[in-house]
Amino acid sequence: MNLNEYQLDNDGNFDSGFIDNSMHSSNGINVYFRDLEKHLIGHINNADLVIGAVAWLTSDAILDALACVKNVQIVVQKEDFLRPDVYSRTNWKSKLRSKYDALKCDLTRYEFGNILSSASVASDPTIDAVRCVGNHNRDKVPAFPRMHNKFLIFANVQEIQNSFGHTHYKVTPYGVWTGSFNLTKNASMSLENALYITEPDIVDAYFKEYGQIAAMSEKLDWTTDWAAPQWRIGT
């Protein structure tokens, strides 16, 4: 059952029913309650760069849209099924990894303009399109620290060439998507909400927070249950 399509029984005496209360305001905030996946994909399609932190990323439709974006960098919660060396009796894990492998990030950490630019500056500057962070809940403890964010940031990327002929890129974030909506296969059938925010100070705050989460992230083939960042601040 899709809860977004549910209606109460009506005895016919009142001409009313459940409606979509989504709205667009003039102060840089849009509110969505229905068709969230469709709205999110629309924002993804317009971006040069999509970055963010989401607990889980398993929606085929969203992953297919992200595969068409020039640059993507998303941090997810550390889970056992993310590791390529973990055997799965079903093919969903290998399919998910192939979806992740289709995403690309040609930008270096130094071009993001947040704390990522200061992370292990003497090491390989590349960054994977999908990384993980947090603690692996091996014992399935209910109250366990997780990276439970659900936000994506949309940015323009400008190519700049200096007087020496060297090219670098300037990242300019312009919008944030956040709310209860998980980027998973079944979330579109649940009652969820999302905000799309373009107010510059709020966008910048999310951009800085993303940088901190990404700076403490690890590759998907993690080896330690507890958080084990690949980088440090400085060299």
Residue map of PLM features:
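PLD/PLD-like phosphodiesterase catalytic module centered on the HKD motif
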Residues: M1-L49, W56-T235
